[in-house]
Structure formats: structure tokens, C-alpha cells
């Protein structure tokens, strides 16, 4: 290894990728049955049709906040990989302590 630290076969500094996949509308990947299963787990018997889009919106905002905090922890530690502990600390910061993943 020629002094590249941990990692392996890094060629250069990265730069722009040729074909960058455009990420859009991924929230639709949270399907109606998936939302229904989560509601069932929470003890819900009947679900209004309007719930699905509302749930997607709320989930998107929640995940954006958690991911933003987790990435902030990662950047502060001068790392490029978000670890499970970063997510645990981000959740703890928002008052949603999660046990079982270290920390």
C-alpha cells in the first residue's frame, strides 16, 4: 500500500462521477402496505386513505432532521462514513434515545 491509509484502491481525490443517479421521489418507496404494517404494529385497526401521503411527509421531515444531525457528528469527527453511533447520538439529541447500538 502506498500510504493511502485505510481504504484500498482509491484513485485520486474523486471528482465528478460520469453518470450521477438523480435521486427524486424516493419517499414513494415507502409503500402503502409498509405504512399499513407500521400502523398495525402501533395498534391501528382502520386507516383513512389520506393517511399515507401525510405519513410519508412526516417521515421525510423526521429522517431529514436525524440524518442532518448524524452527518454533523460525522463531519465534526473528520470522517466520511456515518456510523451507528452517529445516528444514536443524533436521535438522543432529539430526545429519542435508542438502546442496543452502542454508546
Swiss-Prot record:
The modification N6-acetyllysine is found at residue 17. It is found in: Nucleus; Chromosome. The modification N6-(2-hydroxyisobutyryl)lysine is found at residues 6, 9, 13, 17, 32, 45, 60, 78, 80, 92. GO terms for molecular function: DNA binding; protein heterodimerization activity; structural constituent of chromatin. Butyrylation of histones marks active promoters and competes with histone acetylation. The nucleosome is a histone octamer containing two molecules each of H2A, H2B, H3 and H4 assembled in one H3-H4 heterotetramer and two H2A-H2B heterodimers. The octamer wraps approximately 147 bp of DNA. This is Histone H4. It comes from Styela plicata (Wrinkled sea squirt).
